[in-house]
Amino acid sequence: MRTSQYLLSTQKETPADAEVISHQLMLRAGMIRKLASGLYTWLPTGVRVLKKVENIVREEMNNAGAIEVSMPVVQPADLWQESGRWEQYGPELLRFVDRGERPFVLGPTHEEVITDLIRGEINSYKQLPLNFFQIQTKFRDEVRPRFGVMRAREFLMKDAYSFHTTQESLQETYDAMYTAYSKIFSRMDLNFRAVLADTGSIGGSASHEFQVLAESGEDDIVFSTGSDYAANIEFAEALAPTEPRAPATEELRIVDTPNAKTIAELVEQFKLPIEKTVKTLLVHAHEESGHKLVALLVRGDHDLNEIKAEKLPQVAKPLTFASEEEIRAAIGAGPGSLGPVNLSLPVIADHSVAVMSDFGAGANIDGKHYFGINWERDLALPLVADLRNVVEGDISPDGKGTLQIKRGIEVGHIFQLGTKYSEVMKATVQGEDGRNQVMTMGCYGIGVSRVVAAAIEQNHDDRGIIWPDAIAPFQVAILPMNMHKSFRVKELAEELYTTLRSHGIDVILDDRKERPGVMFADMELIGVPHNIVIGDRNLDSEEVEYKNRRVGEKQMIKTSEIVEFLLSQIKR
């Protein structure tokens, strides 16, 4: 590609509304342009990277035995009503009616569509297992799209769905997808981890996320220092304390706390250790519990894990917190004064709360707290469960080492769905015994456009993007100095351009009438890994200058050796 025939579209200024570095650099490098909130046009440089990612994904899916299909973005509402997700999915599901007043959705995912397809195409166990994938646009009506393509409303995704008659067969495909995903992200030179995860709205049993490590990531992922245990913080189990509860040393007393409406204010004003305080959170109770609200207790320095809480049978799904109006109607006090003593609601305490003694909590009276609370003296020990997020230093759930926490960007997710969709949609085949059998399913997704942003978060400096070779828009940039005035500079540039292209190298020849500084800055900004500078002075000694974008080193290479040298440097 020649820059004179290309839309480079680079920008010097950083857009004010771009929060994360990947969004900033994708705009500055001319990869994307915003059309509307959460909607982006991909420009030529962005498309080249997107296609590189897409091709790696497609190759590894094919290598793993998956079969490519293409399903419609627009889906009939009756399939979502049949699966039960019409009500469950929420406002992220964009719904509309056609001119015939028939309801449809823009697909955020395709479990319903693929299940409908396969129940009409597959009728015997002999045809299974099969694994189908597509790389296609999805739409989720995010309440607050942000971070550019990292959390956009429209995005490119690879989604795959496998069908089986046994759990053993599903496990084999699941393992194959785990391996394929590891190969995909390794080929892109991404620093990633596969972590245990919650299945979320997709449903099913076993699940792993593939997380690219980055400070800008939205997810907290935990690792053991003593084993290969890794999990999303939502999934990570907080082990119950093994030490017994200390005996009571304080009397129960009620204290005026008019200016302490949060744990932080309580700790600051009364110089309490935060680990000696308890937060009381009221959530809506399951309708079969006989109560409207249920109280959840966590230690003052811990955070409630909403995923764990939502799985409790006493808690309504999805988990929702009580409003201040509801709290006052039930308790007679505001949210900042809640506590377990004399509380006329079901109470569930975290394991760490159950071993506390002499602790402080709200008195269920505005502006008052109890200090010196002790279980089995001042109140009965409630139900106990794992309710909190793990913290650094916790014992690993496998008992080996302690936990560390890092930030990650989720770029892939694999699920063992089981019969969640096939059973309700009556997707059956004739089994080996001649009877109809519900198919078992797996589901495997990669956020293709999100991978592009995640790669930038890991690969950049103050001058721009530093692409790994495998997904760079161009692998080599040829920068001829004054080629429009020097015949031999132009001749070598054209010869090198033609030769590299014949070797299958993606190369960009900067044939603009621009100052060298502009040419260098643009190629650094868009992240070309290998740069060749051709100048008259160096040609006197039959040399050109090579610069590696990642390490920044320059070296002189003989013109007769440059092609062989570049082929040895490019990771293909």
From Swiss-Prot:
UniProt entry tagged with the keyword Transcription: no
What are the protein's UniProt keywords? Aminoacyl-tRNA synthetase, ATP-binding, Cytoplasm, Ligase, Nucleotide-binding, Protein biosynthesis
Could you tell me what reaction this enzyme catalyses? Answer: tRNA(Pro) + L-proline + ATP = L-prolyl-tRNA(Pro) + AMP + diphosphate
The EC number on file is: 6.1.1.15
Any idea which GO molecular function terms this record carries?
aminoacyl-tRNA deacylase activity; ATP binding; proline-tRNA ligase activity
The record describes the protein's role as: Catalyzes the attachment of proline to tRNA(Pro) in a two-step reaction: proline is first activated by ATP to form Pro-AMP and then transferred to the acceptor end of tRNA(Pro). As ProRS can inadvertently accommodate and process non-cognate amino acids such as alanine and cysteine, to avoid such errors it has two additional distinct editing activities against alanine. One activity is designated as 'pretransfer' editing and involves the tRNA(Pro)-independent hydrolysis of activated Ala-AMP.
Q: What is this protein called?
A: Proline--tRNA ligase
